[in-house]
Amino acid sequence: MRAVLLRLAGFTGLPLVSILTPFLLIPIVSRVAGEGGWSTVVSGQAIGAFGGAVIAWSWNTLGPVEIAQNPSPQHRAEVYRQSLRTRLVLSALVFPFVFILAWQLAAPDHRLDGAAMSLTTAVAGLSPAWYCIGAGKPALLATFDALPRVAATIVAVPVILLTTHIWLYGIILLASVGVSLVIFHRIVVPERGKTFASRGGTWQYLRQHFGPAAISLSGTTYAATPVPIGQAFVPNAVMAGFSSADTVYRFGLFSVMALGNTFQGWTLEPQDASPKKRHTAAIVSHLALGLAGAAFLAILGPLATEIIMGSVNKAGQLTCALYGLSFLFISASTPFIRNLLLPQGRQRLILVWTLISAVIGIALMVLAATRGWADGIALAMALSEAILFLGLLMPGLRLLRKA
């Protein structure tokens, strides 16, 4: 238990700084952008999040398992080399796509802002976080994933205040992340000249791991679509508050990710402690986090958005409550997916339920958006997350009993 507490401190305490730092930027961006520009910025980030999932492919789900189960430095270096080859190929395709899509959906006066913000989230697909998680090294995660974002945000605050150009944040962040990735590569891959020497297996890897990647992509698709769908059909004045609720919700999801990072390596590593007890601890912890997050969003969400984004961008009570339900279900389903089903090769089951929930969720979102019902979009997302959780609950519990 001491080991997991140390990991919890590392994987939550250190990245917590990077989670909170953007709150320095949000009040500035939301006020500089105004109603129309704020929803454009959030829409661009959501589009980029989908692009980031494409770039990451299957590495965020299978990568930590591969690293955790084989401690050989040579093996880990080769795994990271393969990941870099595949992700750079995908980046060359994804970056232009998300930039153009965000540009097209943006408010006319904020096209460059929306397009640039799409790149700030798409670049997350190149993050080495999955490697650090599998290796159980939160200090690496903080140094090469959290710190570059913190530094970029601190630099961007005075730049945006002085220039009122939101798009400059995208350039600053991309530069910061790029430098950190080069340094990280030199640390984990000490042998020079081999990273790009073997390119033949890149497309083969992408084909072989399409299943796990599809799970991540389909899940990210419906998670990232609420604001872009609303942006296409709902007036900007209405979408301003909705976008604020979406932003607070997505910052909250970092806590789910951090807790999942803490438990994934711990539950999968060979240990004397009972696997069932470790899995149960992860499930209970995620459920408690989900309930706490849902309560916060439902009760304090409107106040938080008013303080952070300004009264003109304040989210409604119902919108926040529905986002709270989504938070609960996504937190509760995380340990079943990451710690039980995926390591046991149940990718097809996860993919089927993810696609079912995504299709239903997106269809209901579009239906609500075309009728101008913003809260209906949030309701559709909550329903889709509930469907996914319920569909995976019993298979996950059966695996837990066998652990």
What kind of feature is each model-predicted range?
Residues 1-4, 142-143, 166-168, 172-173, ...:
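Interhelical loop/hinge segments that connect adjacent transmembrane helices in multipass membrane
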Residues 3-59, 210-237, 361-362, 366, ...:
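Signature of the first transmembrane helix
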Residues 6-19, 44, 49, 53-102, ...:
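Membrane-water interface segments that mark the loop-to-transmembrane alpha-helix transition
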Residues 9, 45-53, 242-261, 293, ...:
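Transmembrane helix-bundle signature of multi-pass secondary active exporters and lipid flippases
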Residues 35-39, 102-117, 299-329:
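Interfacial segments at transmembrane-helix termini and the short loops linking adjacent helices
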Residues 56-71, 248-273, 340-343:
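Helix-loop junctions and terminal segments of transmembrane helices
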Residues 111, 115-121, 143-192, 356, ...:
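Hydrophobic alpha-helical transmembrane segments
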Residues 121-144, 327-353:
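Membrane-interface junctions at transmembrane-helix termini in multi-pass inner-membrane proteins
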